[in-house]
């Protein structure tokens, strides 16, 4: 008789099935989230839940979405975007060199689209591009649609709301001139190749879910992809301990500059 699947065995099966290695996440937090889903679907044990994931594509999509923590909002944490608009972007665009921006863990696209709006107001002679990546293909599909409920637009400045959104049937549709400036791509931050030559990288509210060892590994890889003088922005509730170890210098809360 086969032994009942435990959490370690479940992690192994999930990694093989969807490529997500749960061992990099904080165990207590991740187990709690999985157990919440199991209760919702009335799965008494890991074996039962795994069968559900294998048999029902909707449950699997919900599982992937739930574990990859897809929360997003346009211009979330307004102080960060004020710093971007007033200081960081003008400094990076000085001299007319092309600007490469990467939004990692972009969720439904609110962050990279917010960046594209800010960049569209800079000197029109400046060249820039925004890359947005996420693990969840279903979320990326929603991001490419550019269709949002009103509650995600709470912090959108009025000038951007009027210029770049059209309301239909209670939803807000993003104008194609902004949508077309963002390139979306699926990426597993734990295993896939990282971008290089970036001037600005944002990975916000992602590190809090990982173990300390994984956090440090990701920060090191992000820093390697950043040009000297470029900026790295994390979540306002996150912090990089000893940023100099990674060649970073703290500029403001959640904002770091690569110094070497």
Pin down the residues of each PLM region.
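Extended basic-aromatic, gly/pro-enriched interface segments that bind polyanionic ligands
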Residues: 128-202, 206-217, 239-241, 260
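Conserved SAM-binding loop of SAM-dependent methyltransferases across substrates and taxa
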Residues: 108-123
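Residue-level signal for inorganic ion chemistry
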Residues: 84, 201, 226
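Conserved class I S-adenosyl-L-methionine
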Residues: 96-109, 128-131
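Short hydrophobic/aromatic beta-strand or adjacent loop that forms the aromatic wall/cage
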Residues: 251-256
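Conserved beta-strand signature within the Rossmann-like core of class I S-adenosyl-L-methionine
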Residues: 228-236
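A short glycine-rich, Lys/Arg-flanked "PGG" loop and its adjoining helix->strand segment in the class I
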Residues: 216-228
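Conserved AdoMet
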Residues: 2-102
């Amino acid at each position: 008789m086969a032994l009942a699947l435990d959490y370690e065995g479940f992690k192994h099966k999930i990694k093989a099935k969807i490529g997500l290695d749960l061992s990099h996440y904080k165990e207590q937090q991740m187990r709690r989230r999985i157990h919440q889903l199991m209760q919702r679907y009335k799965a008494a044990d890991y074996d039962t839940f795994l069968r559900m994931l294998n048999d029902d594509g909707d449950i699997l999509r919900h599982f992937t979405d739930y574990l990859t923590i897809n929360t997003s909002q346009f211009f979330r944490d307004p102080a960060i975007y004020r710093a971007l608009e007033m200081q960081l972007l003008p400094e990076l665009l000085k001299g007319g060199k092309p600007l490469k921006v990467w939004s990692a863990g972009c969720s439904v696209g609110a962050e990279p689209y917010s960046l594209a709006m800010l960049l569209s107001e800079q000197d029109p002679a400046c060249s820039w591009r925004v890359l947005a990546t996420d693990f969840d293909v279903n979320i990326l599909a929603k991001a490419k649609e550019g269709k949002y409920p009103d509650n995600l637009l709470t912090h959108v400045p009025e000038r951007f709301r009027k210029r770049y959104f059209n309301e239909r049937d209670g939803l807000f549709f993003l104008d194609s001139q902004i949508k077309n400036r963002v390139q979306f791509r699926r990426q597993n931050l734990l295993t896939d190749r990282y971008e290089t030559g970036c001037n600005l990288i944002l990975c916000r509210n992602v590190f809090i879910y990982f173990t300390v060892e994984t956090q440090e590994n990701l920060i090191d890889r992000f820093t390697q992809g950043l040009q000297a003088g470029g900026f790295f922005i994390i979540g306002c509730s996150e912090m990089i301990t000893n940023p100099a170890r990674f060649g970073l210098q703290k500029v403001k809360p959640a904002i770091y500059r690569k110094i070497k």
